[in-house]
Curated annotation (Swiss-Prot):
<keyword id="KW-0113">Calvin cycle</keyword>
<dbReference type="GO" id="GO:0016984">
    <property type="term" value="F:ribulose-bisphosphate carboxylase activity"/>
</dbReference>
<dbReference type="GO" id="GO:0019253">
    <property type="term" value="P:reductive pentose-phosphate cycle"/>
</dbReference>
<dbReference type="GO" id="GO:0031470">
    <property type="term" value="C:carboxysome"/>
</dbReference>
<protein>
    <recommendedName>
        <fullName>Ribulose bisphosphate carboxylase small subunit 2</fullName>
    </recommendedName>
</protein>
<dbReference type="InterPro" id="IPR000894">
    <property type="entry name" value="RuBisCO_ssu_dom"/>
</dbReference>
<dbReference type="InterPro" id="IPR036385">
    <property type="entry name" value="RuBisCO_ssu_sf"/>
</dbReference>
<keyword id="KW-0120">Carbon dioxide fixation</keyword>
<comment type="function">
    <text>RuBisCO catalyzes two reactions: the carboxylation of D-ribulose 1,5-bisphosphate, the primary event in carbon dioxide fixation, as well as the oxidative fragmentation of the pentose substrate. Both reactions occur simultaneously and in competition at the same active site. Although the small subunit is not catalytic it is essential for maximal activity.</text>
</comment>
<dbReference type="InterPro" id="IPR024681">
    <property type="entry name" value="RuBisCO_ssu"/>
</dbReference>
<dbReference type="Pfam" id="PF00101">
    <property type="entry name" value="RuBisCO_small"/>
</dbReference>
<comment type="similarity">
    <text>Belongs to the RuBisCO small chain family.</text>
</comment>
<keyword id="KW-1282">Carboxysome</keyword>
<keyword id="KW-1283">Bacterial microcompartment</keyword>
<comment type="subunit">
    <text>Heterohexadecamer of 8 large and 8 small subunits.</text>
</comment>
Length: 122
């Protein structure tokens, strides 16, 4: 008899969608369309997993002011991933009317246990 063991390492929970299953490519595209349809400005942030919960994340280029093409946002996500393959990447929709984030979710996350200082124990 074989006993199946799974990877029980903790998943980072950095936002509401962290508690749901990973988004499919179509669901990510739909989230980008939602951000654009709200009139919000898409932007990307990235950070190494060991520092993801301890300080602000670095921004990838400038926010994509005036971008109406979801494929352009996807292309930027791919470029950020190519430049920082081991970083977590978050997509943000900035609301310029209320001057705050209207929406955000992590596009790429990692598994790992974090201690109280936010560092990875792997």
């Amino acid at each position: 008899m074989s006993i199946q063991t799974d990877d029980y390492r903790t998943k980072y929970t950095l936002e509401t969608f962290s508690f749901l299953p990973e988004f499919t490519a179509d669901e990510i595209y739909d989230q980008i369309v939602y951000i654009i349809n709200q009139g919000w400005t898409p932007a990307l942030e990235h950070e190494a997993p060991e520092a993801a919960s301890s300080h602000y994340w670095g921004m990838w280029k400038l926010p994509m002011f005036g971008t109406r093409d979801p494929n352009a946002v996807l292309a930027e996500i791919d470029q950020c991933r190519a430049a920082y393959p081991n970083h977590m990447i978050r997509l943000i929709g900035y609301d310029n009317y209320t001057q705050c984030q209207g929406h955000n979710f992590c596009r790429f996350t990692v598994l790992g246990e974090c201690n109280s200082h936010g560092t990875n124990n792997e």
